Design a protein with these regions (language model features):
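Membrane-water interface segments at the C-terminal ends of transmembrane alpha-helices
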Residues: 22-59, 171-282, 310-331, 362-378, ...
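Membrane-helix/interface signature in polytopic inner-membrane proteins
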Residues: 279-289, 299, 554-564
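Glycine-rich helix-loop "coupling/hinge" segments at transmembrane-helix boundaries
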Residues: 330-354, 436-439, 606-633, 667-671
Length: 671
């Protein structure tokens, strides 16, 4: 009876737990860091998209003129600019399409104009919103402005702004620009196929053979991560350029163009693909191979029916990562691309070369599309890769096979020789007096203060940027990841934060840098004061590399038992004590990994900062680009190698600190 009575009770109101001080503080931290991502990422991208859809055209119906006789008398006749243009044919419809910074001289409407003439001119707009310039003076409104002939030649029209698809129409109707899309896609696909194939062979050799020196080969394979993407381009010029050591190997072909871009892309994307594929092969289940052996399947059949299916997600993920890296890279095609245009270089040419910011924004949007598609597919693939290993899985262990092991050793040796050769030729070129005429050794190429590019100050700026990025980036990323992972409830806010945290990985550095110009260079923006300072370089670098750092921190935090929070709550300890005394010490290895990741990428990045540096904040990676542009290729190679050695030193320091930290704070892991 009692059970029936209880069952008959009407449902009551849902009781929600009252939020405590810690809950509000943690949600506040999420809001603050989310605001940072909105200001540093979402709003600049919105500004760039707005610029891409902003069209400018000279509206001749908005301007009217009066012309006096030689005695300075006006007869009251009013001419519109449109009427004068129809009569004289001074400007075609294409001439009237403009950018925001373009100007149109009004003297073009008067074929007989002479600045020595005694004729006087009057100009006005047809509405109060119409503006024109008389020299540096900005004039507006419907009031007549009078000019003598000498002053009239300084009067120019400003284009009228509107919103539409005009910029995209112009882009896709320009064959040279559209060809860049095809070039970028072809180069990226070819580079991806070759790189993933080579990386798979290398990773397979490391995981499935018993060859010697695996650690050394793995170390060499990671070296390209420590140099800017421009460096392999410089090395290829010294090897296969017009005065290269191995020019004859090209058999009349030029290294400047697709061949050079593909070869250089293989070099700098190889470690990324190798790491992903190595991880995929490392989680193979030995029971599947035992089953194949018991069924008397050949090694070839086992490879295609067990190994490849087991590594398929890693291969797909590696392919899209490499594709994204190649299609968004700017430094390499800028150095060795020659006349072979690609999208990333087109952005640079439109913005720096032609000052056409609207078209630069359009190219950025076009580049954003394949990058977003590749990123989205990669994320889908990574989600499907979960739970490939079960609790009953057995880790695969390679068995000695002398012939196979030597084959793997030879293969890895060839790859290692290629990587060492690229780095070695750069160092050799940096020590040569004058290639190829005077091959005596000298340190003259390290006299950076005598070269264009920023000198040694650029190198010091890079170290400063890397240290600031590593420190502030690690703090922001880890605090943000902690708040998202450890905050209870607040599902909508945490989901929104995760979305913002994932966005930077899909945004090419060139696109982010251009977006920063539109957003932070706006005088109406209260944050305009950070433009052209070290602060904006730090901000853009942290934002550009935020996603990988966030995922690293989140992975480390997910490995911690949630009981820590429950125990702290039962002891009435505030969350910040748990954070400082437990979470940070436990996750210290991951924190150190985040800091070195940010440091190395800040030293090598080009695309994210190429639009944002000033004369006082030039960086080493930018100095490499500028010295190469100026023809100082050997000093450019020397600066590139300085970046390499700095990153090696940083890695060694990181390894030493990590080892000490593991001994002092992570001994519990071995119990």
């Amino acid at each position: 009876m009692l059970e029936m009575a209880v069952a008959a009770l009407p449902p009551g109101k849902e009781v929600k737990a009252k939020l405590g001080r810690d809950d509000w503080l943690m949600r506040g931290f999420i809001a603050v860091i989310a605001l940072y991502l909105i200001v540093a990422l979402a709003l600049p991208l919105y500004a760039m998209l707005s610029k891409a859809f902003s069209t400018y055209q000279f509206d001749l119906t908005q301007y009217e003129f009066q012309v006096s006789d030689e005695d300075g008398n006006f007869d009251g006749t009013i001419f519109s600019a449109a009427e004068l243009n129809t009569e004289t044919g001074a400007f075609s419809s294409e001439d009237l399409i403009a950018g925001s910074g373009d100007r149109l001289a009004v003297t073009g409407f008067f074929p007989d104009f002479s600045f020595r003439s005694p004729v006087i001119y009057k100009v006005r707009g047809t509405s109060n919103s119409v503006t024109f310039l008389a020299g540096s003076e900005r004039l507006t409104g419907t009031e007549w402005r009078e000019f003598d002939s000498n002053a009239f030649r300084k009067v120019v029209m400003r284009p009228a702004a509107s919103t539409g698809l005009g910029n995209f129409t112009r882009y896709f109707s320009t064959p040279a620009l559209v060809r860049s899309i095809q070039n970028s896609l072809v180069i990226s696909i070819i580079s991806t196929v070759i790189t993933v194939s080579l990386a798979f062979g290398f990773a397979y050799s490391l995981n499935r053979s018993c060859m010697r020196f695996k650690g050394l080969f793995r170390l060499i394979a990671m070296a390209p991560i420590l140099v800017p993407s421009l460096l392999p381009g410089i090395a290829l010029v010294y090897l296969f350029g017009n005065q290269g050591i191995l020019k004859a190997v090209m058999m009349g072909e030029s290294i400047y163009g697709p061949y050079g871009i593909i070869a250089g892309s293989i070099f700098f994307t190889f470690p990324h693909a190798m790491l992903i594929i190595t991880t995929a092969l490392a989680i193979s289940d030995a029971r599947l191979y035992e089953a194949a052996t018991s069924l008397r399947a050949s090694r070839w059949k086992t490879f295609w029916t067990v190994t490849i299916p087991g590594a398929r997600y890693g291969l797909i993920s590696a392919a899209f990562v490499v594709f994204n890296l190649v299609i968004t890279d700017f430094g390499l095609p800028k150095v060795i691309g020659g006349q072979f245009n690609v999208l990333a270089v087109d952005i640079y040419k439109q913005v720096i070369g032609q000052q056409n910011f609207e078209m630069g924004a359009v190219v950025s949007v076009v580049l954003l599309v394949p990058a977003l598609i590749a990123f989205s597919i990669d994320r889908i693939v990574q989600r499907k890769q979960v739970a490939l290993l079960s609790a009953r899985s057995v880790v695969y262990e390679a068995k000695p096979n002398k012939t196979f092991d030597w084959m793997c050793f030879g293969y890895c040796g060839i790859i290692a020789f290629f990587i060492i050769g690229i780095l070695g030729i750069c160092q050799y070129a940096a020590l040569i007096k004058f290639w190829p005429y005077d091959l005596s050794l000298s340190l003259n190429n390290y006299a950076f203060d005598l070269m264009d590019g920023g000198g040694w100050q650029a190198y010091r700026n890079s170290i400063k940027l890397a240290l600031l990025t590593a420190f502030f980036g690690t703090v922001v990323v880890f605090v943000g990841a902690y708040m998202v992972e450890k905050t209870e409830g607040f599902t909508s806010g945490r989901t929104a934060f995760q979305f913002l945290a994932m966005m930077p990985m899909a945004i090419p550095g060139m696109v982010l840098g251009l977006a920063y110009i539109f957003f932070f260079n706006n005088p109406a923006n209260p944050l305009n004061f950070i433009y052209a300072t070290m602060a904006i370089l730090v901000l853009s670098t942290i934002t550009h590399f935020y996603t990988v750092s966030h995922l690293t921190a989140a992975t480390a935090l997910k490995q911690m038992d949630n009981e820590f929070e429950s125990v702290a709550a039962s002891l009435k300890q505030p969350f910040y004590k748990l954070f400082a005394r437990v979470s940070v010490p436990v996750c210290l290895p991951a924190i150190l990994d985040i800091s070195i990741y940010l440091f190395v990428n800040a030293m090598t990045t080009v695309s994210a900062v190429v639009f944002l540096y000033s004369s006082g904040t030039a960086l080493a990676s930018i100095a490499v680009l500028n010295m190469d542009d100026a023809g100082d290729i050997a000093p450019a190679a020397a600066m590139g190698m300085m970046i390499f050695y700095t990153n090696i030193a940083a890695r060694l320091i990181h390894a030493g600190i990590s080892r000490g930290v593991l001994k002092r704070t992570q001994s519990w892991r071995a119990r």
